C-alpha cells in the first residue's frame, strides 16, 4: 500500500507544474486605508519567490534589457514611487522583466516584480503615459498584495498560465486598482487620459487580450465603470502632464522590436 501511495505522489509531481493550496482570509479589501489583502511577510516572500521557477520554465523566453533600456524603465518606476510616497509605504523599488512573447501580457509579483510581454510593448503601448499606466497598475497590486488567496508550490516549473492566474481580481478589486493607478499616473506627471485609452484598447481587442483579461464581459464593464468614475471626478489635482513621449521611450520601444 505504501508503495502505491508513493507512486501516486510521483505521478502527480511529474504531471503538474504546481500544486495550488487555498489561502483563506476573512478580511475585506480597503485600498484607501492601506490594508493589504494578502497580509503576512511569509506569504509575500512565498509569492515573490515564484519569479525564479517561472523564468526557468520550459517555453518561457526572457528578453534581457541592455543597460540603457534598463535604466529607462527603472527611472519610470522611480518617478511613480517617488511622486507617490504617501501611497507606497512598502515598495521602495521595482524591477521589470520582459517576456519574449507576442501575446499582450502584464502581471506582477510582490516586492515590485513586474512582467511585461514584448507583444504588449510593441503593439499596444503607443505612448509613454500608457506605459506608466500599466506600470502603476502593477505597482499598486504589488504594494497592496492584491493576489489570489492561495499558495502555489512549484514542482520543477511554473507555467505562464498560472502566473497570469495570479492577476485575476474581482471587478470591485480591479476598479479600485484602476482608480488608484489613474491617480498615481497623474501625480507622477503623466497624462491620465491614456488610462481610459488603455482600457479601451483591451476592450476593442479582446481576441488578443483574452489570456490577460480572462472574462471578456468584465473588461467591457471595467471600461463603462471607469468612464463613470472620470465623469464624477471633479477635484483632480492640477499637475503639469507630459503630453509628448520622451526620446528614451521611443528608444526603448525600438530596442524591444529588434528581438528576433
Region annotations inferred by a language model:
Residues 121-129, 138-155, 189:
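Catalytic Zn2+-binding segment of zinc metalloproteases
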Residues 135-144, 176, 180:
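Active-site His/Glu-centered metal-binding helix of metallohydrolases
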Residues 16-71, 83-91, 122, 172-260:
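C-terminal capping/extension segments of zinc metalloprotease domains
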Residues 97-112:
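Catalytic zinc-binding patch centered on the HExxH motif and its immediate surroundings
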Residues 115-116, 130-138:
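Short alpha-helical catalytic segment bearing the HExxH-like zincin motif
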Residues 145, 151-172:
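Substrate-binding clefts and substrate-entry loops adjacent to catalytic sites
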Residues 3-13:
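Bacterial N-terminal signal peptides
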Residues 59, 82, 97-101, 117-118:
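N-terminal post-signal-peptidase region of extra-cytosolic proteins
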Amino acid at each position: 500500500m505504501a508503495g502505491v501511495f508513493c507512486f501516486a505522489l510521483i505521478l502527480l509531481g511529474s504531471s503538474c507544474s504546481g500544486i495550488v493550496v487555498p489561502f483563506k482570509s476573512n478580511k475585506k479589501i480597503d485600498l484607501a486605508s492601506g490594508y493589504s489583502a494578502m497580509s503576512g511577510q511569509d506569504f509575500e516572500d512565498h509569492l515573490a519567490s515564484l519569479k525564479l521557477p517561472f523564468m526557468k520554465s520550459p517555453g518561457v523566453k526572457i528578453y534581457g534589457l541592455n543597460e540603457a533600456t534598463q535604466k529607462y524603465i527603472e527611472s519610470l518606476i522611480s518617478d511613480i514611487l517617488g511622486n507617490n510616497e504617501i501611497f507606497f509605504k512598502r515598495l521602495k523599488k521595482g524591477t521589470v522583466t520582459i517576456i519574449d512573447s507576442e501575446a499582450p501580457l502584464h502581471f506582477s509579483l510582490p516586492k515590485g516584480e513586474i512582467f511585461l510581454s514584448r507583444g504588449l510593448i510593441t503593439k499596444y503601448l503607443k505612448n509613454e503615459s500608457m506605459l506608466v499606466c500599466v506600470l502603476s497598475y502593477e505597482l499598486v497590486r504589488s504594494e497592496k498584495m492584491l493576489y489570489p488567496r492561495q499558495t502555489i508550490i512549484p514542482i520543477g516549473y511554473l507555467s505562464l498560465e498560472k502566473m497570469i492566474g495570479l492577476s485575476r481580481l474581482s471587478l470591485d478589486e480591479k476598479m479600485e486598482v484602476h482608480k488608484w493607478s489613474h491617480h498615481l499616473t497623474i501625480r507622477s506627471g503623466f497624462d491620465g487620459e491614456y488610462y481610459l485609452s488603455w482600457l479601451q484598447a483591451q476592450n476593442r481587442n479582446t481576441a488578443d487580450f483574452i489570456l490577460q483579461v480572462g472574462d471578456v464581459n468584465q473588461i467591457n464593464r471595467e471600461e463603462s465603470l471607469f468612464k463613470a468614475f472620470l465623469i464624477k471626478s471633479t477635484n483632480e489635482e492640477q499637475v503639469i502632464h507630459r503630453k509628448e513621449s520622451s526620446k528614451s521611450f521611443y528608444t526603448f520601444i525600438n530596442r524591444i522590436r529588434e528581438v528576433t
